[in-house]
């Protein structure tokens, strides 16, 4: 097959593109910047998803589309860009794919459509009401509706995957990581909360600053440690490829992520023990993050089996962290 991978310069898209090439497929990338992938079986279109001409060039001659690219932000200043990339862009890529008579279109949505961090019940299944509370979540839900519409009015097969939070294992202990830095490390978390304008959180965090980098165990205002899903990129790629090829995926909506959530009360002490970094704990205002999302449907329907639980990811993260210290 020849497969279009949007977001081919990103974490998941670049990994999936390389994996497809390794399996003997031809791949076309489509992203705002070059992917850096070098293969005779790879070509790419550099441009915006909402550029109809670029989307058509990207879609022509491919058998399937993995629409993994998106713009992610929670900043009010980015809302116009969010809607252009994630709603207009998805519509335009869908229409280009349908015009090119693409066989299957796989769309990367998000747990933000529920949203996972404020669930009405747990574990969160695909039947949970979709009532997003962030502009990003709204754009992904609108994208889902566009995909379902195209599936109704054209012969193109469609699949929707609601992504878990995704990371490379090597990022877990990297304080410069966009996600893991402020999630697990004190100084990046202080900078994040300053950017959000959360003065009370900043005050509490700065009171813990010992002058050197430390890990931080975040709890809610009642002392409950955070809990969330963190899924390895390799497991996400495995689920994406099942959505691309499995007959039972057609027309489906699937949560894609790790089977078990990560309890910060367990993982942070383990990180501290394996690295020797100091560990501090903080209770921040609000209910905090505490959720469990079910992946039962994709396991039972498509045979998805994650292979990289957080403990295995952490072992790899420690190796990467050790290399950075030398």
Each language-model region and where it sits:
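Amphipathic terminal alpha-helices
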Residues: 310-326
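NAD(P)H-binding glycine-rich loop region in Rossmannoid oxidoreductase-like domains
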Residues: 36, 47-85
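N-terminal Rossmann NAD(P)H-binding glycine-rich loop of SDR-like oxidoreductase domains
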Residues: 3-23
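Catalytic helix-loop patch of NAD(P)-dependent Rossmann-fold dehydrogenases
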Residues: 84, 119-160, 181-184
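NAD(P)-dependent short-chain dehydrogenase/reductase
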Residues: 149-228, 233-235
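Mid/C-terminal beta-alpha module of Rossmann-like enzyme folds, strongest
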Residues: 227, 235-285
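NAD(P)-cofactor binding segment of oxidoreductase domains
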Residues: 65, 77-105
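Conserved Rossmann-fold NAD(P)-dependent oxidoreductase catalytic core, especially the SDR/UDP-sugar
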Residues: 92-135
């Amino acid at each position: 097959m020849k497969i279009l991978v949007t977001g081919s310069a990103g974490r998941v898209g670049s990994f999936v593109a390389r994996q497809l090439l390794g399996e003997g497929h031809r791949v076309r990338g489509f992203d705002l910047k070059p992917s850096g992938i070098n293969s005779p079986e790879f070509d790419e279109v550099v441009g915006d998803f909402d550029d109809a001409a670029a989307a058509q060039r990207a879609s022509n001659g491919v058998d399937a589309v993995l629409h993994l690219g998106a713009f992610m932000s929670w900043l009010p200043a980015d809302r116009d860009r969010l809607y252009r990339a994630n709603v207009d862009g998805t519509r335009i890529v869908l229409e280009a794919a349908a015009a090119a008579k693409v066989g299957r279109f796989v769309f990367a949505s998000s747990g933000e459509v529920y949203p996972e961090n404020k669930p009405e019940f747990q574990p969160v299944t695909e039947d949970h009401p979709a009532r997003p509370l962030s502009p990003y979540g709204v754009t992904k839900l609108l994208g889902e509706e566009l995909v379902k519409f195209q599936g109704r009015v054209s012969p193109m097969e469609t699949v929707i995957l609601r992504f878990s939070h995704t990371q490379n294992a090597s990022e877990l202990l990297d304080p410069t990581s966009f996600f893991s830095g402020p999630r697990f490390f004190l100084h990046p978390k202080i900078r994040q909360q300053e950017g959000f304008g959360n003065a009370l959180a900043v005050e509490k965090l700065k009171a813990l600053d010992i002058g050197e980098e430390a890990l931080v165990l975040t709890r809610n205002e009642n002392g409950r440690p955070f809990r969330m899903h963190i899924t390895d990129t390799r497991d996400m790629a495995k689920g994406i490829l099942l959505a691309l090829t499995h007959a039972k995926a057609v027309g489906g909506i699937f949560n894609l992520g790790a089977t078990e959530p990560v309890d910060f009360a367990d993982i942070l002490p383990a990180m501290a023990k394996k690295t020797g970094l100091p560990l501090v704990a903080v209770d921040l205002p609000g209910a905090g993050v505490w959720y469990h999302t079910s992946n039962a449907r994709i396991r039972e329907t498509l045979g998805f089996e994650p292979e990289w639980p957080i403990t295995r990811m952490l072992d790899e993260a420690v190796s990467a962290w050790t290399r950075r210290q030398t």
